[in-house]
Amino acid sequence: MVNVKVEFLGGLDAIFKKQRVHKLTLKKNNSDDEPVTVGDLIDYIVENMIEDKNDVEVFLQNGTVRAGILTLINDTDWELEGEKEYELEDGDIISFTSTLHGG
């Protein structure tokens, strides 16, 4: 089990009931011992936090975070941390920031 803070910034909060910050407690397969990964977090977000399933494509594309969304793990680009394979730790802050803006 792991406690993390998840932030949706740059307008992404619009698909999450306009709430920018969420505190989550996650378990993998109802096990307290198995590590929870960022991939598990993304699955949880898609399955439980996006109300309108038509909005999933705003966040996800081809099974991963959509291009144009900067993903940070504790202020470090997730590509440097192993992307979806990163094992979450208590107190981690995962930020998703849309860099795409209409105009």
UniProtKB/Swiss-Prot annotation:
The record's subcellular locations are:
Cytoplasm
Where in this chain does the entry annotate a coiled-coil region?
none
Q: Which GO terms describe its biological process?
A: cell budding; cellular response to oxidative stress; invasive growth in response to glucose limitation; protein urmylation; tRNA wobble position uridine thiolation
- Name listed for the protein in its UniProt record: Ubiquitin-related modifier 1
Query: Which gene codes for it?
Result: URM1
Swiss-Prot/TrEMBL puts the cross-link Glycyl lysine isopeptide (Gly-Lys) (interchain with K-? in acceptor proteins) at G103
Question: What molecular function terms (GO) are annotated for this protein?
Answer: protein homodimerization activity; protein tag activity; sulfur carrier activity
Q: Which residues carry this modification: 1-thioglycine?
A: G103
What HAMAP family does the entry give?
Urm1
The Gene Ontology CC terms held by the record are: cytosol
| SUPFAM superfamilies assigned | MoaD/ThiS
Quote the pathway field.
tRNA modification; 5-methoxycarbonylmethyl-2-thiouridine-tRNA biosynthesis
| InterPro entries reported for this sequence | Beta-grasp_dom_sf (IPR012675), Mopterin_synth/thiamin_S_b (IPR016155), Urm1 (IPR015221)
Please provide the record's keywords in A-Z order: Cytoplasm, Isopeptide bond, tRNA processing, Ubl conjugation pathway
What does it do? Answer: Acts as a sulfur carrier required for 2-thiolation of mcm(5)S(2)U at tRNA wobble positions of cytosolic tRNA(Lys), tRNA(Glu) and tRNA(Gln). Serves as sulfur donor in tRNA 2-thiolation reaction by being thiocarboxylated (-COSH) at its C-terminus by the MOCS3 homolog UBA4. The sulfur is then transferred to tRNA to form 2-thiolation of mcm(5)S(2)U. Prior mcm(5) tRNA modification by the elongator complex is required for 2-thiolation. Also acts as a ubiquitin-like protein (UBL) that is covalently conjugated via an isopeptide bond to lysine residues of target proteins such as AHP1.
Q: Name one Pfam family in it.
A: Urm1
Family the UniProt entry places it in: Belongs to the URM1 family.
Concerning PTM, the database record says: C-terminal thiocarboxylation occurs in 2 steps, it is first acyl-adenylated (-COAMP) via the hesA/moeB/thiF part of UBA4, then thiocarboxylated (-COSH) via the rhodanese domain of UBA4.
